UniProtKB/Swiss-Prot annotation:
InterPro entries for the chain: Chap_CCT_zeta, Chaperone_TCP-1, Chaperonin_TCP-1_CS, Cpn60/GroEL/TCP-1, GroEL-like_apical_dom_sf, GROEL-like_equatorial_sf, TCP-1-like_intermed_sf
Compartments where located: Cytoplasm
Keyword flag Phosphoprotein: yes
Any one of the GO CC terms: chaperonin-containing T-complex
Organism: Saccharomyces cerevisiae (strain ATCC 204508 / S288c)
Protein name: T-complex protein 1 subunit zeta
Gene this chain is encoded by: CCT6
Repeat recorded as keyword: no
Location of Phosphoserine modifications: S249
NCBIfam families: chap_CCT_zeta (TIGR02347)
Length: 546
């Protein structure tokens, strides 16, 4: 009881009790999330303290927004949420694998096997899994020209987040968005150049893809044009309003004339800037009524300046978001200016159509019909906040799924095919050659059995019997082994049978599986080797003297 001598208020759990807490917590978290897994998974309703509702089946959203008390469950939740940050998917998979690895290991520990021996087996199995993954993957080249295949990848990801009807709407939107910002020559892809804009209007099925930019504000003057064709776009980061001096100073006047002169001199600074902008507009547009001029400024524009722009038929937007300034340059081809001293036609962008749309009290400005834009917008629509949030989460995961394939140049057949094939491989492999001797084999056995939790859960969530469906899959794999042919066999969740995911167009991300297996094995091993739980941290509250 050395801990009690050091800290009388400390609480501890030793060996069996600590392991039981860890296993129970992991299984509890698994039982909450496993019903979400796959395209047939169920939704969870999250209600916060203010009564706001969120419907989701996204594991990352659940783990980050649920209130979790158990320290073990918090550890697993944080690690699984980190998986989503890195790869964009696989959160529920990690939680299910950790829970099942601990459950299978606990069975052997109760029979007298030491946790260290099991974790050694886990590590051998993990290394073999990575080798098997590299053999199982299908390499793809020239993906930017294979839109049909990328549509299948996006559909596979989106089906696990939203219903089938909405998936068919979002699949081409997500694929086209990634392709529009992907630079195949430099193999460069920046998903930050895809703007996701929410509009509380219509339904999620009215979500659209804009090959351009949508700004969530409009012109601030009633006389400004709301639709500009063949628009020259000036991107500015210049204050077009009167600013106070940097040093504290005062100006005093003794008559109305002096006040008018003072006001006029204050305006001179801004008027000089306006004159240079209007001169540039006259130079590029002249008297041609088919040409327009648009100013998008990151800083403010005062009412008098707006009035001047309106008189010259210029659409001016003020206080644009900083993140949109870079996107505007990629969309229109213009260059952002920090001053009006060196304005020339070469720094202007061009857009075929800039128009304004008003929904309720909100204004949106569309910058469209551009030549080869390198930034785009996905306009998410929905009648409620939770519908918008659910669609936005699905779109983000879909974007990451397509981006992962373009970056990896590899893909894994889905529908649980990889987990079933890897489990068979580990069970049939010569464990002595793998370096597993004696009781270490129990770790590999536990690992192989735990892998089947993913296909079993997929089938169970579809309403079929997991044992029956997996038996059919095993039979088909046995037939393929007898005839020495390579066959990918997964589970068909629509009819409860086996299927070939490469024919059905069901795919998993290479990097998601790689990170999920590595992450789950690491978490499970650490929790198995934890033989004592201490609640002995310093209190943040100062203790009152006795």
């Amino acid at each position: 009881m050395s801990l009690q001598l050091l800290n009388p208020k400390a609480e501890s759990l030793r060996r069996d009790a600590a392991l039981k807490v860890n296993v129970t917590s992991a299984e509890g978290l698994q039982s909450v999330l496993e019903t979400n897994l796959g395209p047939k998974g169920t939704l969870k309703m999250l209600v916060d303290g203010a009564g706001n509702i969120k419907l989701t089946k996204d594991g990352k959203v659940l783990l980050t927004e649920m209130q979790i008390q158990s320290p073990t469950a918090v550890l697993i939740a944080r690690a699984a949420a980190a998986q989503d940050e890195i790869t964009g998917d696989g959160t529920t998979t990690v939680v299910c694998l950790v829970g099942e690895l601990l459950r299978q290991a606990h069975r052997f520990i109760q029979e007298g096997v030491h946790p260290r021996i099991i974790t050694d087996g886990f590590e051998i199995a993990r290394k073999e899994s990575m080798k098997f993954l590299d053999e199982f993957k299908i390499s793809k080249t020239n993906l930017s020209n294979d839109r049909e295949f990328l549509l299948q990848v996006a559909r596979s990801s989106l089906l696990t987040k939203v219903d089938a009807d909405l998936t068919e709407v979002l699949t081409p939107i997500v694929t086209d968005a990634v392709l529009s910002v992907y630079d195949a020559q430099a193999d460069n892809l920046d998903l930050h150049m895809v703007e996701i804009m929410q509009m509380q209007h219509l339904s999620p099925k009215d979500t659209t893809f804009i090959k351009g930019l949508v700004l969530d504000h409009g012109g601030r003057h009633p006389d400004m044009p709301t639709r500009v064709k063949n628009a020259y776009v000036l991107i500015l980061n210049v204050s077009l309003e009167y600013e106070k001096t940097e040093v504290n100073s005062g100006f005093f006047y003794s008559s109305a004339d002096q006040r008018d002169k003072l006001a006029a001199s204050e305006r001179k600074f801004v008027d000089a800037k306006l004159k240079k902008i209007i001169d540039l507009k006259n130079e590029v547009c002249g008297m041609d009524p088919d040409k327009g001029f648009v100013i998008i400024n990151q800083k403010g524009i005062d009412p008098m300046s707006l009035d001047v722009f309106a008189k010259h038929n210029i659409l001016a937007l003020r206080r644009a978001k900083r993140r949109n300034m870079e996107r505007l340059q990629l969309v229109t081809g213009g260059e952002a200016q920090n001053s009006v001293e060196d304005l020339s036609p070469q720094i202007l962008g061009f857009s075929g159509l800039v128009y304004q749309e008003t929904i309720g009290e909100e204004k949106f400005t569309y910058v469209t019909e551009n030549t080869d834009p390198k930034s785009c917008t996905i306009l998410i629509k929905g009648s409620t906040h939770y519908a918008l949030a659910q669609t936005k989460d699905a779109v983000r995961d879909g974007l990451r799924a397509v981006a992962n394939v373009l970056k990896d140049k590899n893909i894994i057949p889905g529908a649980g095919a990889f987990y079933i094939a890897l489990s068979r491989y580990l069970r049939s492999a010569n464990m002595n050659k793998l370096g597993a001797k004696g009781k270490t084999k129990t770790g590999i056995e536990a690992f192989a059995e735990a892998l089947l939790v993913i296909p079993k859960t997929l089938v169970k969530n579809s309403g079929f019997d997991p044992l029956d469906v997996l038996a059919m899959v095993e039979d088909e794999l046995d037939d393929a082994q007898d005839s020495d042919e390579t066959r990918y066999v997964g589970v068909d969740l629509n009819i409860g049978d086996s299927c070939d995911p490469t024919i059905e167009g069901i795919w998993d991300s290479y990097r998601v599986l790689r990170n999920a297996i590595t992450g789950a094995t690491g978490i499970a091993s650490n929790l198995l080797l934890c033989d004592e739980l201490l609640r002995a941290g310093r209190s943040t509250l100062k203790e009152t003297p006795q």
